[in-house]
């Protein structure tokens, strides 16, 4: 895919994909797995999230992980997708700020879960992490929105970039033999 300068680039797509994957792995999977590990060591009352407590107590750990993956997919994929589809203006950097907020929250949640499981002093209280997370969403999406207004980024089609990457991998594989 060629841009206006004649340079083939999908780095915007790769950056956003990496941020999405990082947020999914930390806020979605990492938090769920470390929560279960912490509950194994401290008991169900160690979990600060009442919804997670209810899910694990009544439906088991596998249902909790399935629910967390489902909810994470909706929050990280469908909400930004709807924002991009409905927006007249570019929202690339705004969505990157959104993903970065979830990544930071996921890392902090994992750290707190591991500290609680090991009976260590907590870096932050869960309420502080939630406040920080909500603040980051507000700040980073606002900054991203302003950057989008000033730079007007031209983002390539995700599917075209994906096909281009597949073609590069296949070319590399066939040229090796």
Q: Across the structure, where does each feature detected by a protein language model lie?
A:
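Hydrophobic alpha-helical segments at protein termini of multi-pass membrane proteins
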Residues: 2-177
């Amino acid at each position: 895919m060629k841009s206006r300068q004649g340079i083939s680039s999908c780095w915007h797509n790769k950056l956003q994909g990496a941020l999405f994957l990082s947020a999914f792995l930390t806020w979605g999977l990492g938090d769920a797995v470390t929560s279960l590990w912490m509950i194994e060591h401290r008991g169900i009352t160690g979990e600060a999230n009442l919804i997670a407590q209810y899910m694990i107590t009544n439906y088991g750990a596998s249902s909790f992980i399935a629910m967390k993956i489902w909810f994470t997919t909706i929050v990280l994929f469908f909400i930004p997708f709807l924002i991009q589809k409905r927006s007249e203006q570019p929202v690339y950097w705004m969505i990157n700020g959104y993903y970065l907020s979830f990544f930071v929250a996921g890392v902090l949640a994992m750290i707190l879960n591991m500290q609680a499981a090991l009976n260590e002093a907590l870096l932050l209280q869960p309420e502080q992490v939630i406040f920080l997370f909500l603040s980051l969403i507000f700040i980073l999406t606002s900054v991203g929105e302003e950057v989008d207004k000033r730079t007007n980024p031209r983002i390539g089609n995700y599917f075209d970039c994906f096909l281009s990457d597949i073609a590069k991998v296949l070319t590399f594989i066939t040229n090796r033999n």
